[in-house]
Swiss-Prot record:
The gene is groES. One of its GO terms (biological process) is chaperone cofactor-dependent protein refolding. The lineage of its organism: Bacteria, Bacillati, Bacillota, Clostridia, Eubacteriales. It comes from Clostridium botulinum (strain Alaska E43 / Type E3). The keyword Lipid metabolism does not apply. This is Co-chaperonin GroES. Keywords: Chaperone, Cytoplasm.
Length: 94
């Protein structure tokens, strides 16, 4: 897969949701919560605001937390990805 996001956009791939609760109950289908943790797979060049270039704060390979209702889901080569703006990323998980 080769995709190059524009501006301050980032392409992420969701990490898998937990299959079990802490008490051991196995979750299936819609019972699994949609994860808000993902891995960055592509990063745009950044944006320009009032003539100043705003650098991207994330890089490919970073694990991030993102806003629940953000981004656009896309499917490429049978894989599901999300394209969202850097502002929709809440934190980098270290």
């Amino acid at each position: 897969m080769r995709i190059k996001p524009l501006g301050n956009r980032v392409v992420i791939k969701r990490l898998e949701a937990e299959e079990k609760t802490k008490s051991g109950i196995v979750l299936t289908g819609s019972a699994k919560e949609v994860p808000q943790e993902a891995e960055v797979v592509a990063v745009g060049p950044g944006s320009i605001v009032d003539g100043t270039k705003i650098e991207m704060e994330v890089k490919v390979g970073d694990k991030v937390l993102y806003s629940k209702y953000s981004g656009t889901e896309v499917k490429l080569d049978g894989e599901e990805y999300m394209i969202l703006k850097q502002d929709d990323i809440l934190a980098i998980v270290e």
